[in-house]
């Protein structure tokens, strides 16, 4: 598992209080992990801070799953 995946999982577990076993690549923040719209905004802000990347609103609106977040961060960090 990549460093990005581990760090994203850690942020999600800390912010949403979910079991790490539920934080899998295709898990939806809202449908599978119980996040609401405020939670998703806070997750995006936490990802930006942790990885030193900017996630524009347009991009944030396309990040629905753990895998989406990892792909965006890896691409933005490259």
Swiss-Prot record:
Keyword Cell membrane tagged: no
Pathway info: Lipid metabolism; fatty acid biosynthesis
UniProt entry tagged with the keyword Ion transport: no
GO molecular function, one term: acyl carrier activity
Gene3D superfamilies, sorted: ACP-like
Domain (Carrier): residue spans on this chain: 2-77
Modified sites of kind O-(pantetheine 4'-phosphoryl)serine: 37
SUPFAM superfamilies the UniProt entry points to: ACP-like
PROSITE patterns per UniProt: CARRIER (PS50075), PHOSPHOPANTETHEINE (PS00012)
Keyword set, alphabetical order: Cytoplasm, Fatty acid biosynthesis, Fatty acid metabolism, Lipid biosynthesis, Lipid metabolism, Phosphopantetheine, Phosphoprotein
GO cellular component terms, A-Z: cytosol; membrane
Main location, first listed in the record: cytoplasm
PTM notes: 4'-phosphopantetheine is transferred from CoA to a specific serine of apo-ACP by AcpS. This modification is essential for activity because fatty acids are bound in thioester linkage to the sulfhydryl of the prosthetic group.
A Pfam family this chain is assigned to: PP-binding
Compartmental location: Cytoplasm
Family membership: Belongs to the acyl carrier protein (ACP) family.
PANTHER family: ACYL CARRIER PROTEIN, CARRIER DOMAIN-CONTAINING PROTEIN
Function: Carrier of the growing fatty acid chain in fatty acid biosynthesis.
Protein name: Acyl carrier protein
Naturally occurring in which organism (per UniProt): Bartonella tribocorum (strain CIP 105476 / IBS 506)
């Amino acid at each position: 598992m990549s460093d990005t995946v581990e760090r994203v999982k850690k942020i999600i577990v800390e912010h949403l209080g979910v079991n790490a076993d539920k934080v899998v690549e295709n898990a939806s923040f809202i449908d599978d992990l119980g996040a609401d719209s405020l939670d998703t905004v806070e997750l995006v802000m936490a990802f930006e801070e942790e990885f030193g990347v900017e996630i524009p609103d347009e991009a944030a609106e396309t990040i629905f799953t753990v895998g989406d977040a990892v792909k965006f961060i890896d691409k933005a960090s490259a």
